[in-house]
Amino acid sequence: MNDSQTIIDAGKEFDFGKTSADYARFRDIYPDVFYEQLTSRNLCINGQSVLDVGTGTGVLPRNMYRFGAKWTAVDISAAQIEMAKLLSQGMDIQYLVSPTEKLKLPKGSFDVITACQCFWYFDHEKTAPLFHSLLSPGASLAVMCMEWLPYEDTIAGASEELVLKYSPQWTGAGEIVHPIRIPECYSDHFETVFHNEFKVKVPFTRESWNGRMKSCRGIGASLSPAEIEEWEKEHIQLLSEIAPERFDVLHYIAFVELKSKIT
């Protein structure tokens, strides 16, 4: 879901901290080509200071750490950050618990800001000027996502229908390949310089795909434990009927780079 004008799940509350264990286990699934979108643009590499907003369990900084950048990562959920710290042992990554909109960090202190799988959650009227102030002049804001394609992949479509059965207000359904929408308020502070969208097959087992779906906002982050258990039983049965033990799910990757305007 990339349209920031959509009211997420019709206002239904969600908390990814409720699903941190599954999130950590089943959502570190991005292929190498996902991270290459950054390095091919000379982003998040040696000598750069990077801020990852909406970091979740730290998937992006952990996987990009090998390229030599200095990472700071923030998330609103203390549970997600605790899991990120656990998974990042031995890595020099600074983690902070804060809403992105309320970040208190030195102005001009970052060469890159990344927003992976989270951009649509922000209050953009606040984050657009905030991101500009945190970046050095001419630095980059990189926004990324990877979504399954329910109309092109039978297994993804069937799993998505089951999520909607239990969470009909969930607005994460119905993805098609499209550029990430950047709200107009960013144009005062940034210029879009590059974007890319392409399809990719991501490998799963029945267990890992069930875990990926269970950790989505419409299930693990918003349903009660009893509802999650009921959904999972039905989903496991569904997969036993429609999916082999190992299979690929068709996704698309979208990436956009914005340059901070020099004022």
Named regions from a protein language model:
Residues 2-45:
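Conserved class I S-adenosyl-L-methionine
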Residues 103-112:
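A short acidic, Gly/Pro-enriched loop at the edge of an enzyme's catalytic core
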Residues 112-116, 124:
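A short beta-strand submotif of the Rossmann-like class I SAM-dependent methyltransferase core
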Residues 122-131:
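A short, conserved alpha-helix within the catalytic core of class I
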Residues 125, 180-263:
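Conserved Class I S-adenosyl-L-methionine
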